[in-house]
Amino acid sequence: MTLKILYLVSKNYHDSKMSRVRFHSMEAVFKKCEGFSYWGPGYSSSRSTWDENLTCQENIDKEFPGVEWDLVVGFKPLGMKDFKDIKYRKCLRYNEMFDKNFTINEIVQSGADLIICHHYNDYIEYKELFSKVKGPKPITFKFVPHSAEQTIFKPIPEIKKTIDVAIVGATNVQTMLGEHYPLRARMVELIKKLPKQYNVKVFPHVGGNHSDAHTDKYAKEFAETINSAKIVITDCGAPKSRFGKYIEIPMCGTAIAGDVYDDEPKDVERLKEFLIEINMEMDDYEILESLVYYIENTAERKFLIHKGLEYTKDFTHEKYAQRFIEAINE
């Protein structure tokens, strides 16, 4: 590819952000480009150091003289001086967009030309919203679904599945939507009611920032945790979003239990082929009965695992990179 893509992000964010999906996915994109680089606050090279007193464009020109970028992708763009005045096409990518005031303000104030939405329900909502608003320039919205890093999230045969049911991810998180992960919060207590012969475990969230997150240590540990369980419970949260765990768990060859997200209709139908569906409308007995059934019935559980592994082949970061490049070229 002859594309040249620059990713502007604070080095502190890059190095310490525990969730690595935003960086793994862009690194997959970079592999398909002729020219690519990270740059932003905290970065330095033999040529220059990012200067907070200079504009984004001035910092870009100083570090990359003569380079004509096809796309500049920004993370937290309003924290960088005059991101809006960058002369190249500007792109923002979003995992969650439930805080509408914040998101709309960031899109408008950053001067973004292209918005990549990782959740289909967000894509539909914001595309419709901005179609009704006349701004200084048109903004293009594209849907590129969440994917996962297949070199990390994969079956690890040497790890025995000694846990029958596990819960992973944040719980008891309050946002403007209320309890952000209602099913997970409920299940923390409910799985304790499973018969005593079953080994159940709640793995607390390790926190959003760690100085060594860039080593992928926490992502690898998370993949090992998933591999240690027969069934892992997650949920789509108050926004009903297709969170990354809906790819990471089945990609590890583990059965996933959770509720059905609101996303692209064909994708939702594929989800139902391998999901052990539990939801807030079910009573405690129904949920526990479903979990026990799939713990005890190995053949049925393995069938779901096989379906999940087949599904996730479409959501590697290699596939993300292909879709991302198609989106920016349309």
Predicted regions and their residues:
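Aromatic/hydrophobic pocket-lining residues that form the small-molecule binding cavity
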Residues: 222, 226, 287, 301
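Nucleotide-sugar donor-binding catalytic core of glycosyltransferases
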Residues: 2-251, 255-272, 318
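A charged, aromatic-enriched C-terminal amphipathic alpha-helix characteristic of glycosyltransferases
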Residues: 298-328
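Residue-level signal for the nucleotide or nucleotide-sugar donor/cofactor binding architecture
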Residues: 244, 282, 315
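Short, contiguous hydrophobic alpha-helices characteristic of membrane insertion segments
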Residues: 256, 274-282, 323, 327-330
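Amphipathic alpha-helical repeat elements characteristic of tetratricopeptide repeat
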Residues: 216, 284-285, 302
